[in-house]
Amino acid sequence: MIVPSSNTTMEREFNRIVPGGFSIHSARMRMKSVTEEDLRAMDRQSVRAALELSDAEVSVIGYGCMIAVVSRGRGYDDVVRKRIEKSVHIPTVVSATAVIDALKALGAARIAVAMPYTEELAKSELRFMEKCGLAIVDYRTLGIEANTAVGNLEASVAAETVRSLDSKKADALLISCAQMPSADVLDELEGETGLPVLSTNTATLWAMMRRIGYATPITGYGSLLSGVARSAGGRANLRHPRKPPVPVQGSYRR
């Protein structure tokens, strides 16, 4: 994985989720604050980080920062992937692409999103998703700029943020940010809402496993990895949903 230097979540969650026989290795790009300037400076370090990982002869690389890519607009995820693959000739997954592909695999066209970002960066992500063909029915963002502060959150914060979304018209719920801890609450949230709930990290891992041909279900971390609910339309396979809460923040508008 290639992660921001201040990311303390992605490696921890991946090591918890991946089955035996796999090992996780990472290289870091310097970034402390989630600002446009810092994100661009960080992104310029991606090839150096990929070269370091290539020395370990890894099978697949995951670029683990959603907002650094989506804030640059639709198509930049492909730019990042091609840049890394051209440099090291290793299959590469970009988190932004993985999230879109995972939502499509679930049959989700309408989503509600929980994020930790500042409002400006959050809206850049929502625009990216809309341009990829998704409808945003609701969102909530926490306005946090310091990346370590996001990593220090309990997974319960992600859960409460998701619970505050108006999910009545959603096909799936997304916890967006590789630094926002959430793996331990995904199954619980699916049971409460009756909807697929995925995170940037579970989508990235799902896509990386697909790139290397691994298709065995992984249980305990949401239906995307377990295969319990293979589409948003199949959400009746999950436990009975509870009534959605009143939204804290209104539906997204341009």
Specify the residue positions occupied by each region the protein language model found.
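N-terminal glycine-rich anion-binding loop in soluble enzyme alpha/beta folds
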Residues: 2-48, 117-154
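Short, glycine-/small-residue-rich phosphate/pyrophosphate-handling segment
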Residues: 1, 105-127, 213-235
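Short, well-structured alpha-helical segments in soluble
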Residues: 43-56, 157-170
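Conserved beta-alpha
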Residues: 80, 84-145
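Periplasmic-binding protein-like
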Residues: 59-64, 112-114, 170-177
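Short, flexible loop segments at boundaries between secondary-structure elements
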Residues: 144-149, 195-217
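Glycine/small-residue-rich loop that forms an oxyanion/phosphate-binding "nest" at active or ligand-binding sites
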Residues: 50-97
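Hydrophobic alpha-helical
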Residues: 160-192, 204-205
